[in-house]
Each structure stands twice: as C-alpha cells, then as structure tokens.
Amino acid sequence: MSTKSNRRSFLKNATLLAGGAFSAQSIFNQAYGAIFEDLSARYNAFSPGELAVQEDYWSTIQQAYSASSAPVLNLNNGGVSPSPMLVQQAVERYNQLSNQGPSYYMWRILDQGREPLRERLAALGGADPEEIAINRNATEALNTVIYGLDLSRGDEVIGCYFDYGNMMQAWRQREEREGIVYKQLDFEFPIEDDDLIVQAYKEAITEKTKIIHVTHVINWVGQIMPVKKICRMAHEHGIEVIVDGAHSFGLLDFKIPELEGDYFGTSLHKYLSAPIGSGMLWIKKEKISKVWPLLCNGEPKSVNIRKFESLGTRSFPIEQGIGEALNFHNGIGTKRKEERVRYLKNYWAEKALAIPGVRIHTSLKAPYSCAIAGVSVAGMTPKNLENNLLSRFQIHTVAIPYRNLDCVRVSPHVYTRLSDLDKFLRALGILAGENSPQNMGEKGA
C-alpha cells in the first residue's frame, strides 16, 4: 500500500476514534467485545444499584485498564486516574500522526475535532456547547474565573479551608495583590446535615460579599457538598457561585446547569478517565462576556466561549483522546459508575470499621460521599501510614495531614477489584495490630 493510502487510512481511523459512537469493539479487543456485549444484554434490566455488585460485569471493565495488573495497587484515583488502554492507544496514534507533520496534522486535522468534542462534553454535562471550553485541568479552568472576574478592594469572597489548594492560593494571591477579602469557613467532616453547611455560608455573607466558591466533592475526604442549596441561597442574596467540580464530573450523576451555579470547572483525567492533562470550563452563557481570559485573546470581552481556549501550542493528541474516554464512559453510564464506585468505597470502609484502632473520616451515606474516604490508624501519622502501605504492601494512597484531618485518602475506581480492597484491608489490619496499645506497650517493655 502506498504512503498516501496509509495516511488516508490513518486519518479515517483517527476521525472514528475522535467521534465514533460507542460499541463494545471500540472499547475492548475482539474477544472482550463479544463478552461485553453478552454481559450488557444479560444485565440490561438491572438497576445501577443492582449492577454495582455484579462482579462478572465489572471484571470485563477492569480488563480494559492496564492499571488493573500494575505492580503497585493505585488507590489514589482521586489524584489522577489512569485511562483505559484504548484511550492510551488513541493518544499514541494521534501523537504519531502529529509528528508526521506537526503544524499540518495538529492545526488542520486534529484541531477540527474540537467542535464535535465540545458538543459531546456538553451533552454529558447537560449544557449548551457554547458554554463549554476545553482546557487542561480544573486549576486552569477555575483560575480563569478566579482571575477573570472584576473585583474591587474590599469585595468579599467566601470559600472554605477544604477547597482545593490551588484555588485557595489563587484567591489569596488576589487578596494580597488587589486588597479583596477572602473569608474561609471551617468544618468538621463528615457532616450529614445539608442545612448546617448552607447556614455556615449564609452567616458569612455581608453586604460586601460578591462570590461564593464551593467545592462539589471535597478532595481531602470526599464530602459531597450541597451545591444546589448553596447556589440558591447565594442567588437570593445577589451573589455569584463558582463550583469546583474536579472530583464530581464523570462520577456523580448530575447535569451542570442543575447545580444552579454560575461557573463550573473540572478535570477530565479523574473519574472520566480521559488523558492526563485534560479539563473543562463551563460558564453560564450570559456571564461569558464579563470574564477576562486567563491567557491573552484578541477579543477579551467577547461572548464566545472559545476565547478561553487561547492556549497556544497544546497537546492535540491528549485533547482528542477525550473522545475515546467519552465512548468508554458512556458505554458504562454515569449512574452505573457512581453506584459501583460508591459500593467499592463502602465495601472496604465498612470492613475497616471492624478493625480495632481504625477510624473512617467520611460518611458512608450516599448523599454525602461516593468514591473518596479518609482512614487513619491509631498510633500512626498519616505519612507513616502512607509510607508503610507503599513500602511494605505496594499500595499507593496519599497522606492528608491537614487542619483537623489526620488520615490517608483512599479512592478506588471502576477497575479496582474486590481482591484489591481485600489486600488493602489485610494491610490495615496488620498495621493496626502492630500499633495497638498492647503491642506498643510490649515494645516499650
């Protein structure tokens, strides 16, 4: 076959990868595809909750991830999630194509896939495509809004100490540089009372309050915040709301406009399993013109959402790989994913509660948590627990030694097996036993 024919075939396949409708064969190789189609037919009548405990269904999904057989068990998917192998392969193929002639294939071929991708992301989020900007992560998305809104000296912004660190730093920088007032609430999580949280934000409001910044799912311990109730309360006082959806989009079953916020930013490389370094910004259409772009644009006061995509040279392979992640995600379904991951979290957390010396720092009730939970072992610092889990048991978690939290964050994903969680529980049991008062007393004798 000629080089020209090869290239034409490659481009055709690339287009299919970016926008093709989901099919079992597009997720797995031929063997897995047949199995998945059979499972889908068999479990079609199951509710998401019923399907959450059907291990033969999920074992097929698990085989789509190379991470499921990695030497280190990754239980920090809240930080960044691996992509299914087909997403990795798509990015690799797009990268190969780009390197055949970067300026041509990136700008004139792959870049043409952005508008179809925008439409598909909007469909998943229940939004207008003209409200969706594609970028690299939640920090970039939310910093666009944080730095893009006009505020005057003395104007107040309300957040909390458990918002994501990069967002807190952005507000503190504006406070230091421009003289705005950044007020932060403190909470004792877990909280199983929405009204208590809403009231805390309400009581912090003054006549100078302009913005409330709220995190949908608290990244530290997984608390789900009552975003819709906070937004409604804020709007009653004429206050805009910025929503950090880094840990909710692609995991919780919701539509962005239903939250009733004004601005929403997320990373796509968490529970959507998109390529690492992909994100999204949503701005309510009538608010777009008032937000200055984070990076320069020729029409900064435009109503066109694309003014927030002036990133210069970016990774088009990563951006277009989002399309395959959407295929994979939509093949499962958001509600099915939510119920499965919540089941996995409760599976290990409920058993961990039976281990003497182990404490869970997260609610196990559905309205208040999903994937993430914090765990601690008496007698161990968070960093000591994290280090022991990794060095002795090859389990990767992340220590959270922050404010009133002293725990390790654990976050499974759809590729996590029950046997993986059993391994984690055995490790917790061993470490809790070694650090029990009885054993510690014997060591000191």
Each model region followed by its residue ranges:
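Pyridoxal 5′-phosphate
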Residues: S2-A445
